[in-house]
Each structure stands twice: as C-alpha cells, then as structure tokens.
A protein has these predicted regions:
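A short beta-loop-alpha structural element at the N-terminal edge
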Residues: 1-18
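Conserved GNAT-fold acetyl-CoA-binding loop/helix
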Residues: 18-44
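A short helix-loop-beta-strand connector motif used in the catalytic cores of GNAT acetyltransferases and
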Residues: 44-55, 73, 136
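Conserved beta-hairpin
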Residues: 51-67
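A short, internal acetyl-CoA/4′-phosphopantetheine-binding micro-motif in the GNAT/acyltransferase core
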Residues: 73-84, 108
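Conserved acetyl-CoA-binding loop-helix of GNAT-fold acetyltransferases
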Residues: 85-98, 116-120
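Conserved GNAT acetyl-CoA-binding A-motif
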Residues: 98-110
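Conserved catalytic-core motifs of GNAT/GCN5-like acyltransferases
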Residues: 106-108, 124-140
Length: 145
C-alpha cells in the first residue's frame, strides 16, 4: 500500500537515504565509487527534503521502496534490493501518475534497467543531457508520457 510521508522525521529521512544507497549500489554500477558519498549527501540534505515522498513499507514497518515527486515530475524512485521484482516500483509510479498527475521523469542513460522499466511504463525520451545536473559525466534522459 502506498503511503504519503507528510513532514518526514529525521530518522525517516535517514532510513530513506540508507535505502537509496543500498539500491544504488545494486543498480548504478556505472557510478564512480567516490561519487556515492557526494550523491548520498545531496539526496539526504537536498533531494529528500524538497520532494513529496511516497513509500511502501516492508513487513517490519521499514521502507521497501520510495519515490519523491515535485509538481508533475518523478524526481526519484528506489526499491530495496530485497524487494526488487515485486511490482513495487510500478505501484509507486502508477499511484503518483493517477493521484498527482506525474508524467515526467529523468533517468541516467547508463541505467539500462531503469530506462527499460520506464519505457515499459509508457515513458518516451524527449531529450538528453550529456552531463547530470551536478556536471558529472552521467548522461540524463528526459522522459515523458
């Protein structure tokens, strides 16, 4: 069941950041290891506090998956490695598409699994940037549906 986290507490933001890192270490093999601490700080200090957060909890009341949105854009979607392949990502994306009007997402070009996931969800590439927003050499695909 999708739940909106209104005003997440610091311990919840920490738990989401930990989930982010576990997920990234499995799915973002193209990242330079030294970039992970930089992005982790950015996620915890900037991205999560700025986003409207939706979660799916695991059986122990922790987080199995989460997404963050801003306006009509999906800003982030991460699933715990142990919860991958169970439809949680699809459930989260469909929830915010229906209830929040989300229709845009950016994805790392090197993340073929995520690009394929979004293509199966009906997203199409509308543009590409050679660098990510922090100026690093991780091309970004801008998708819409």
């Amino acid at each position: 069941m999708v739940e909106r986290l209104a005003s997440p507490a610091a311990h919840e933001l920490d738990a989401l950041t930990d989930l982010w890192e576990r997920s990234v270490r499995v799915t973002h093999d193209f990242l330079a290891p030294e970039d992970i601490p930089f992005f982790r700080r950015m996620v915890r200090q900037e991205a999560l506090p700025a986003a409207e957060i939706y979660v799916i909890r695991d059986s122990g009341n922790g987080f199995a998956a989460f997404e963050g949105i801003g306006a009509d854009r999906l800003e982030m979607l991460f699933v715990a490695p142990s919860a991958r392949g169970k439809g949680l990502g699809r459930e989260l994306v469909e929830h915010v598409a229906v209830h929040c009007g989300v229709r845009r997402v950016d994805v790392n070009e090197q993340n073929a699994q995520a690009a394929g996931f979004y293509a199966r969800m009906g997203f199409r590439i509308v543009s590409r940037d050679a660098l990510d927003p922090s100026g690093r050499p991780y091309p970004i695909l801008h998708l819409e549906r």
